[in-house]
C-alpha cells in the first residue's frame, strides 16, 4: 500500500465519518448505541417467540436434515485447532524459507476446508434470531446517524446505506497493517498528552474501525515491551505472529500449572526430589501439560491422582 493510501485510511478512521457522495454516516452517540442494543434484544426475543431458530439451533437442524455433515461440530473444532497448530509451526520454522512456503500452503488449504464446511450454513444464516436482530440493530443505528445533504436521511430501503457502511469497514489484516505503519505510530505515540486520537464528539462512541485500531495498537505496544519480543519480520507477518501468540499463551499456561503443582506439593526443593505428585480431586491442573514437562527432562516424573489421600 502506498503511503498516501495509508494516510487516507488512517485519517478517515480518525475522522470517524463515512462519506459517499452526498451521504454521510457519523459516529453514533453512546445513547444511540444503547438504543440499538435494546432493538437487538427485543428483536431476538420476538424471533424466539415466533419460532425462529437460533444460530446453534440452525446448525443442529441442518445436521438432522443432512444439510450439514454429522461430524460438523467435531470438524469445526478440529479445523480451528489445525489452523492454530499450523500457525505455531509457521513461527517455529520461520528461518526455513522452504518450510514456510509449504506451511503457508497447508494453512491456505485448511482455511478453505473450514470455509467449505460452513458454506451450506451461510446460505441459510439469514433465517436466525441473531442475523435478524443484528440487521435490525444496524438499521436502527444507521437511521440515527445517516445524513443526506446535511439532513437526516431515512430511506425506505436501507440497502444502499448498509452497503456504504459495510465498504467502510477495514478488514482485520488492514487494521493490523495500519497499526504497524509509521504514520499511525507517530500519532499513537502522542496519546495521553492532551491530544485527540479521533475527531469524535464527547458523547460519541468509538466506531468499529477506531476500536479495532486501538486494540491492535495496544497489542503491538505490549509485544514491543515483551521480554520475548519477536523480530520485525515476525511482527509484520500476521499468521506467524499469531503462532507466536499461541506459543506464548501455552508457555504461560504451563508455568501456571507448574506453580499450582508447587503449591500443592510444598516447596520447589521438595518438588524436585519427588517421584510422585499427589493432585487433589477438582484441582485445575492439566495433566498433559505436566507430562510435557516430564518428557523434556524436568523434575516432574509422574502425576498420580490420589483423591482420597489429598482430601
Predicted feature locations:
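Charged/polar, solvent-exposed surface patches and flexible loops
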Residues: 8, 35-42, 81, 112, ...
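Poly-acidic low-complexity segments
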Residues: 73, 78-79, 96, 142-143, ...
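Low-complexity, serine/threonine/proline-enriched polar segments
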Residues: 46-120
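Charged interaction scaffolds used for protein-protein
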Residues: 1-19, 33, 148-311
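Helix N-terminus capping/helix-initiation residues
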Residues: 29, 69, 96, 124-128, ...
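N-terminal leader/presequence-like segments
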Residues: 1-71
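Generic alpha-helix detector with strongest preference for long hydrophobic helices that associate
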Residues: 33, 109, 115-127, 155, ...
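Charged, long alpha-helical segments
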Residues: 119-157
Amino acid at each position: 500500500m502506498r503511503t498516501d493510501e495509508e494516510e487516507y485510511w488512517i485519517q478517515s478512521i480518525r475522522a470517524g465519518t463515512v462519506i459517499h457522495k452526498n451521504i454521510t454516516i457519523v459516529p453514533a452517540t453512546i445513547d444511540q448505541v444503547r438504543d440499538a442494543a435494546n432493538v437487538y434484544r427485543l428483536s431476538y426475543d420476538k424471533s424466539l417467540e415466533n419460532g425462529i431458530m437460533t444460530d446453534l439451533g440452525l446448525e443442529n437442524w441442518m445436521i438432522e436434515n443432512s444439510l450439514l455433515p454429522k461430524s460438523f461440530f467435531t470438524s469445526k473444532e478440529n479445523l480451528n485447532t489445525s489452523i492454530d497448530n499450523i500457525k505455531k509451526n509457521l513461527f517455529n520454522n520461520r528461518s526455513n524459507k522452504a518450510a514456510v512456503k509449504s506451511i503457508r500452503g497447508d494453512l491456505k488449504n485448511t482455511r478453505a476446508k473450514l470455509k467449505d464446511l460452513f458454506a451450506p450454513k451461510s446460505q441459510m444464516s439469514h433465517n436466525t434470531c441473531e442475523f435478524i436482530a443484528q440487521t435490525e440493530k444496524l438499521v436502527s443505528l444507521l437511521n440515527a446517524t445517516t445524513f443526506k445533504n446535511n439532513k437526516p436521511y431515512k430511506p425506505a430501503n436501507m440497502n444502499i446505506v448498509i452497503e456504504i457502511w459495510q465498504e467502510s469497514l477495514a478488514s482485520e489484516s488492514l487494521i493490523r497493517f495500519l497499526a504497524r505503519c509509521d504514520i499511525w505510530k507517530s500519532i499513537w505515540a502522542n496519546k495521553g498528552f492532551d491530544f485527540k486520537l479521533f475527531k469524535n464528539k464527547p458523547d460519541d462512541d468509538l466506531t468499529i474501525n477506531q476500536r479495532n485500531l486501538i486494540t491492535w495498537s495496544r497489542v503491538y505496544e505490549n509485544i514491543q515491551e515483551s521480554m520475548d519480543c519477536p523480530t520485525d519480520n515476525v511482527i509484520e507477518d500476521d499468521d506467524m505472529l499469531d503462532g507466536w501468540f499461541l506459543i506464548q499463551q501455552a508457555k504461560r499456561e504451563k508455568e501456571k500449572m507448574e506453580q499450582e503443582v508447587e503449591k500443592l506439593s510444598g516447596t520447589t526443593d521438595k518438588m524436585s526430589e519427588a517421584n510422585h505428585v499427589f493432585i487433589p480431586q477438582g484441582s485445575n491442573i492439566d495433566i498433559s501439560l505436566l507430562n510435557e514437562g516430564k518428557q523434556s527432562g524436568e523434575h516432574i516424573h509422574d502425576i498420580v491422582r490420589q483423591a482420597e489421600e489429598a482430601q
